């Protein structure tokens, strides 16, 4: 199991009290790693128990409490447990630590006796292990622990810091959980409030629906039990009687007027009402005849050609459609429109005519021309334009004559010539340039003016279109 010791192994023998001696064997050289802890083994010889007690009484430099076996950093033997696997002979090179030989230092308790190598290598590992375990001399070493590593004070500080962090993290988790629970409670409360509001609104709408349904049922019952005063024939007769007849006013009539001839009501009668069939004092039910209203198809409007110019009529009125004069429940005529009286009519008397809103003449906006932009502002429009006179006068018309050659000489055909020529003119040579050709005026022409009715003063109904 063990190899031969190297050259650096020191083997010595010392005699103790008695015939027997203890053999000491140093297993390997000391290196910087195991220098603090000596790795030596004390192999005591086989002897009786009384000899062991006798050796303890001698004044030997070697004390039995000093262990000489391989130990680890905590002072425990390497052969006890699984740490013996870490033990390596000194001759086997280690890949982690170089094999550096160092001189042996003497043992602090004295010289270490050498152990014969033949006794070590001849013994088995189990025998050696049992001998070392059963020997009462083997005791644990009291070597001081190394101070390498963290100090206890720093470890305490680290533990305190870890505890503080753990407590803070736990406190934060508690606060976060409390906030989460509060948010859930608030959300549930808000949802419950919404549910209550919806329930209340639903109850209100159900009550409204029930109320409307009750009203509908009451109206249906009223219609089913209602008895009309007029029969079907009477209703048909009244409706046929109220049909508007066609208009008999000719379109060529210069003046159109229309008014309702109704008898004035009595002093104790119902006042006028715009809507027929509704009075402030009548509380009884009215028949459909009194609430009759003509549709737009039954209204007969006069044609546009019947409306003449405002200068001819001097009034702006338009006849309304012929509306029937209804009768109220009290038997009093109620007009459906209010007549308007005009004092300044053509006939010089006030008549009831229907007022018509004045027609709006659209304004025609013309684009500005280049002439209007270049003309000066002081140029005014003339009040009259010169035109031809209406009096028929004899105006000479000069036209170019046709010269022709007669007998080797040119003759001029002019209607003004009164001689012995072709047209009564004097015979002789004809000068075309000295005669009137009609291309250029021979005298100042007479300009006649024709007066046109151009409006000078502005009038709201005047047509101010450009000439």
UniProtKB/Swiss-Prot annotation:
Cellular component terms (Gene Ontology): nucleus; RNA polymerase II transcription regulator complex
Region (Leucine-zipper): 212-219
SMART domains attached to this UniProt entry: BRLZ
Keywords: Coiled coil, DNA-binding, Nucleus, Phosphoprotein, Repressor, Stress response, Transcription, Transcription regulation
GO molecular function: chromatin binding; DNA-binding transcription factor activity, RNA polymerase II-specific; identical protein binding; RNA polymerase II cis-regulatory region sequence-specific DNA binding; RNA polymerase II transcription regulatory region sequence-specific DNA binding; RNA polymerase II-specific DNA-binding transcription factor binding; sequence-specific DNA binding
Tissue expression per record: Expressed in anchor cells. Isoform a is expressed in somatic gonad cells that neighbor anchor cells. Isoform b is expressed in vulval cells, the uterine cells that neighbor anchor cells and the spermatheca.
Main location: nucleus
Its job: Developmentally regulated transcription factor which binds and recognizes the enhancer DNA sequence 5'-TGA[CG]TCA-3'.
Family to which the UniProt record says this protein belongs: Belongs to the bZIP family. Fos subfamily.
Protein name per the record: Transcription factor fos-1
């Amino acid at each position: 199991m063990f190899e031969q010791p190297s050259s650096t192994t020191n083997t010595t023998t010392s005699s103790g009290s008695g015939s027997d001696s203890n053999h000491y064997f140093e297993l390997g050289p000391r290196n910087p790693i195991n220098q603090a802890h000596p790795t030596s083994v004390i192999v005591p010889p086989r002897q009786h128990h009384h000899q062991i007690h006798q050796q303890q009484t001698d004044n030997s430099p070697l004390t039995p409490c000093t262990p000489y076996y391989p130990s680890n950093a905590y002072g425990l033997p390497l052969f006890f447990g699984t740490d013996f696997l870490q033990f390596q002979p000194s001759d086997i090179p280690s890949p982690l630590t170089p094999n550096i030989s160092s001189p042996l230092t003497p043992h602090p308790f004295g010289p270490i006796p050498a152990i014969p190598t033949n006794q070590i290598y001849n013994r088995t590992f189990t025998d050696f292990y049992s001998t070392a375990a059963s020997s009462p001399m083997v005791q644990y070493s009291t070597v001081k622990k190394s101070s390498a590593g963290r100090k206890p004070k720093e470890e305490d500080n680290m533990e305190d810091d870890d505890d503080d962090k753990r407590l803070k993290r736990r406190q934060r988790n508690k606060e976060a959980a409390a906030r989460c629970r509060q948010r859930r409670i608030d959300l549930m409360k808000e949802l419950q409030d919404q549910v209550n509001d919806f329930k209340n609104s639903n109850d209100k709408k159900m009550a409204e629906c029930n109320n409307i349904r009750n009203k509908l049922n009451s109206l249906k019952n009223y219609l089913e039990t209602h008895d009309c005063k007029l029969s079907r024939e009477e209703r048909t007769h009244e409706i046929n009687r109220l049909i508007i007849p066609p208009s008999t006013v000719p379109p060529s009539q210069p003046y159109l007027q229309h008014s309702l001839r109704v008898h004035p009501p009595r002093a104790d009668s119902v006042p006028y009402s715009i809507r027929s069939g509704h009075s402030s004092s009548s509380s009884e039910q009215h028949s459909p005849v009194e609430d009759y209203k003509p549709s737009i198809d039954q209204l007969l409007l006069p044609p546009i050609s019947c409306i003449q110019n405002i200068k001819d009529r001097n009034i702006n009125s338009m006849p309304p459609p012929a509306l029937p004069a209804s009768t109220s429940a009290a038997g009093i005529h109620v007009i459906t429109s209010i007549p308007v009286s005009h004092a300044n009519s053509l006939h010089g008397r006030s008549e009831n005519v229907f007022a018509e809103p004045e027609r709006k003449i659209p304004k025609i906006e013309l684009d500005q021309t280049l002439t209007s932009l270049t003309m000066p502002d002081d140029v005014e429009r003339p009040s009259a334009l010169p035109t031809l006179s209406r009096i028929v006068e004899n105006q000479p018309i000069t036209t170019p004559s046709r010269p022709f050659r007669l007998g080797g000489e040119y003759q001029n055909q002019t209607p003004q010539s009164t001689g012995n020529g072709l047209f009564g003119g004097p015979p002789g040579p004809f000068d075309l340039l000295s005669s009137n050709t009609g291309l250029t005026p021979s005298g100042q022409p007479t300009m006649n003016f024709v007066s046109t009715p151009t409006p000078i003063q502005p009038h709201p109904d005047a047509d101010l279109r450009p000439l």
